[in-house]
Amino acid sequence: TLIDDTLLDEGRPNVVAAVMITESGDDSAAVVAWAEVSTGRFELFEAGGADMAAEIARLGPSELLYVETADGVAPPRVERLKEAAGCPLTARPVWTFRQRDAVDTVLEQYGVTTLDGFGLDEDDPAIGAAGALIRYLQETQSPGLGAGDGRLGHLRPPKRQACGGSLMIDAASLRSLEIERTMRTGQVEGSLLSVLQRCVTPMGKRLLRHWLCYPLVDRQAIEARQNVVAAFVRDPDLARDLCRQLDGVQDLARIVG
């Protein structure tokens, strides 16, 4: 997973995710831990069946980690998640996902003795995925991201991803609506995102992508966003002045991260 800002797409989050299936069956639950490597954002969520595929598709990871199997073949559900995300799979040792080992990895990463301060429980299945992801990042990322003792100094504490605040768009709908990429070429050019993308900062470009992939469902939040847009429509001089002020602003999220 790339971390050099000069090689990254400034309009997309640079996400690596770890998935762990916690139940058997096609509609079984699975947990995911994901990190935006260049900014340090670190979140966990749980979903089942089609919902998980939809979440993975919207998240758009560049790499998906999973628990290695004895025969070296990824389980069918993991393969479906790979297809939804359109990213490569990486098998990781079983022990990195084991609850006790994963808890120890998380505690050591943040130099704490309990997860209570993060609002997490040591029995939370998502900690297994979180520990495996941290271990992988420690092994693969640049020493420049470390704290000098094997820890990732830029990685924020994990938190539960808030679910239910946006419209669920399944992977097939994301493709057919051509929200982010066209069906014919698989490229951004020609998609809805490319038509609307007029943001002048890298942070704005990623935010617009997020808004399109995670449409609001709360009426008050929708109206609040519309009111801001209306204010700029009524005052084009203000809009132009703001664009001038923002033009040239560097990717602060990745610089700070």
Positions of the model-derived regions?
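Charged catalytic and DNA/RNA-contacting regions of genome-maintenance
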Residues: 1-234, 240, 244-257
